Amino acid sequence: MKKLFFLLLLLFLIYLGYDYVNEALFSQEKVEFQNYDQNPKEHLENSGTSENTQEKTITEEQVYQGNLLLINSKYPVRQESVKSDIVNLSKHDELINGYGLLDSNIYMSKEIAQKFSEMVNDAVKGGVSHFIINSGYRDFDEQSVLYQEMGAEYALPAGYSEHNSGLSLDVGSSLTKMERAPEGKWIEENAWKYGFILRYPEDKTELTGIQYEPWHIRYVGLPHSAIMKEKNFVLEEYMDYLKEEKTISVSVNGEKYEIFYYPVTKNTTIHVPTNLRYEISGNNIDGVIVTVFPGSTHTNSRR
């Protein structure tokens, strides 16, 4: 009897230890900001890094390409804005890792499917393991049919849904509705660590124009998801924040990122680093955002 008691006690302590380690890991997530009252060029010159920068010409088309596009009733998706790596997930077993599909016609950006799989695998390690993808990318024709069948109360016209961009997906739980499921709570608390945001939170319906959708997540990438989580921003607020601040330095878990906003009219010249990785994304309105990543790898991309 004593042996059984000690065995149960040992198992209980192991459980507590695991839970404590998980809590400790999550509590270490840290976001620190530094804003600069100057334009991007001045910041680069004053920081002594201007010799490591080069000029780059940005065209108006780039305003409508990237992971940070604001898509809503005012700013629709353009056909050229759609992610170029859309695939049928049911034909890519390597991308379906840790979650299920509602049916065999779920399409997604390959890049974002990989990010989602990484996130879900970490959730599974913590005991949250009943994720399914109910909807991913929809082309404009499919969106038009959905709008005609469902009406304005339940669907958006073609071009006005984030699903038309390839940047968003609807996530469900095989247990219950997302507002009650462990999967829904986990996403709300942790998705930002993997570059995802809950696009339509319950307390921001007046800003987004969309009712609360605990299942709809959107990829924006780090450090943007971390900033939005820390400041309780939806994408509409974040775009305004970037335009107002113009230059932001942020540390996420000790990794320093720099973010620059540039307004774009016709062909605009901006400054980018020559020795650091960076990404350029449009905002789908009137400018581009340059994100400079930690490290010294000289690669860049236009998302």
UniProtKB/Swiss-Prot annotation:
Substrate binds at residues 154-156, 161. Its EC number is 3.4.17.-. It comes from the Bacteria. The keyword Cell division does not apply. Zn(2+) binds at residues 163, 170, 216. Its cofactor is Zn(2+). It is found in: Cell membrane. Residues 37-56 are annotated as: Disordered. The keyword Thylakoid does not apply. The DD-carboxypeptidase activity is not inhibited by beta-lactam antibiotics. One of its GO terms (biological process) is proteolysis. It is an enzyme of class 3 (hydrolase). It holds the Pfam family VanY. The chain crosses the membrane at residues 7-23. It is a single-pass membrane protein. GO terms for molecular function: carboxypeptidase activity; metal ion binding. Induction: By vancomycin. Part of the van gene cluster of pIP816, the plasmid that confers high-level resistance to vancomycin in E.faecium BM4147. Cleaves the C-terminal D-alanine residue of UDP-muramyl-pentapeptide (UDP-MurNAc-L-Ala-D-Glu-mDAP-D-Ala-D-Ala) or diacetyl-L-Lys-D-Ala-D-Ala. However the physiological substrate likely contains L-Lys instead of mDAP at the third position of the pentapeptide. Also releases the C-terminal D-lactate from UDP-MurNAc-L-Ala-D-Glu-mDAP-D-Ala-D-lactate, a depsipeptide produced by the vancomycin resistance protein VanA. Therefore, VanY should contribute in vivo to the hydrolysis of both the D-alanyl-D-alanine- and the depsipeptide-containing peptidoglycan precursors. Belongs to the peptidase M15B family. This is D-alanyl-D-alanine carboxypeptidase. The lineage of its organism: Bacteria, Bacillati, Bacillota, Bacilli, Lactobacillales.
